[in-house]
Each structure stands twice: as structure tokens, then as C-alpha cells.
UniProtKB/Swiss-Prot annotation:
HAMAP family assigned: Smg (MF_00598)
Family: Belongs to the Smg family.
Taxon lineage: Bacteria, Pseudomonadati, Pseudomonadota, Gammaproteobacteria, Lysobacterales
Transmembrane segments: none
Protein name per the record: Protein Smg homolog
Superkingdom of the organism of origin: Bacteria
PANTHER family xref list: PROTEIN SMG
Length: 157
């Protein structure tokens, strides 16, 4: 089975984290569950490293949303994120779902995935995982979670 870090992360998110946010995150039991699900130890280790990096980059204090300059993307980011992905990030920032720090965290975590390109659905999962890990982002997380399962985007209020 050809799996990626994102496949492991999605499996963890769908089967463990989204069901019980207070789940004791015993790495050994999670790893055993992932191995039983058919993931390789190497990909599991990379996924745990990805999650560790996400938790280490948590902003210490929520900052108010301010309109700042437009983000200019590096060539590697342009290669990995198509125009739909970049437009979606801009949409999220303009509608105050993400602030600039969270956008940068999403970009960092997207670039850390072992995929040459991410499509919009993959990026949405990265955004959802970042928001899930952000204190004070419960409303943004709930909105984003709703968007994952709708064909048409719900308006932001």
C-alpha cells in the first residue's frame, strides 16, 4: 500500500482525535493501532514528527486579526500549492477563519508533507488539523469542519 504522511494523519484524525478530543494520546497504543491498520512504521514515525512539530509551533497568545500585506509565495510553495489552494488560504484569512500566524503554520505543515503537490481537499485537512490544535480556534474549527462535508461553501458571518 502506497501511503503518505497525510494518509496516516487523516486516519489518526478520523479514528482517534475527532472522536475523543480528550483521548489519552499514548503513542505506543496509537502506533500499534496504525500498524494494525496497515501503515508502515516509517510513515507512522513521520506522522508523529509532523504532529510534534505542529504542537511545538502553537502560538502562545491569540492575536487580534489585522489586515496585513498580501502573502508572497516562495517558488517551492507555488509548486506544491496550486492557485485553488492559495486562493482558499486567502479566503480563510480574509474571512477571519485563519490569522496570519495560523496561515503560516498551515503553510509550514503543508510543506512538511511528503507530497509533491497538494490538492484543495488535502489542504483543507491540513487547515482542519491546525485549527484543531489551536487554543481559542473552536469556532473556526467548527466552521472548517462543516466545510469539509459540504459541496457549496457556507457563508462566513
Amino acid at each position: 500500500m502506497k501511503e503518505s504522511i497525510l494518509d496516516v494523519l487523516l486516519y489518526l484524525f478520523e479514528h482517534y482525535f475527532s472522536e475523543d478530543a480528550d483521548l489519552v494520546r499514548d503513542r505506543d497504543s496509537l502506533q500499534n493501532g496504525l500498524i494494525q491498520a496497515g501503515f508502515s512504521p516509517a510513515e507512522i514515525s513521520k506522522a508523529f514528527d509532523w504532529l510534534d512539530a505542529l504542537s511545538e509551533q502553537r502560538p502562545s497568545v491569540a492575536r487580534p486579526h489585522v489586515d496585513g500585506p498580501v502573502r508572497i509565495y516562495h517558488g517551492q510553495e507555488l509548486d506544491k500549492l496550486d492557485v485553488d489552494c492559495r486562493g482558499f488560504l486567502l479566503f480563510l484569512e480574509q474571512h477571519r477563519i485563519l490569522d496570519a500566524d495560523q496561515r503560516e503554520l498551515v503553510l509550514d505543515r503543508a510543506m512538511a508533507l511528503d507530497q509533491d503537490e497538494l490538492d484543495l481537499d488535502d489542504l483543507k485537512w491540513v487547515v482542519l488539523m491546525v485549527l484543531f490544535n489551536q487554543p481559542g480556534a473552536e469556532a473556526a474549527y467548527a466552521w472548517m469542519e462543516t466545510q469539509m462535508f459540504l459541496d457549496e461553501p457556507e457563508p462566513v458571518h
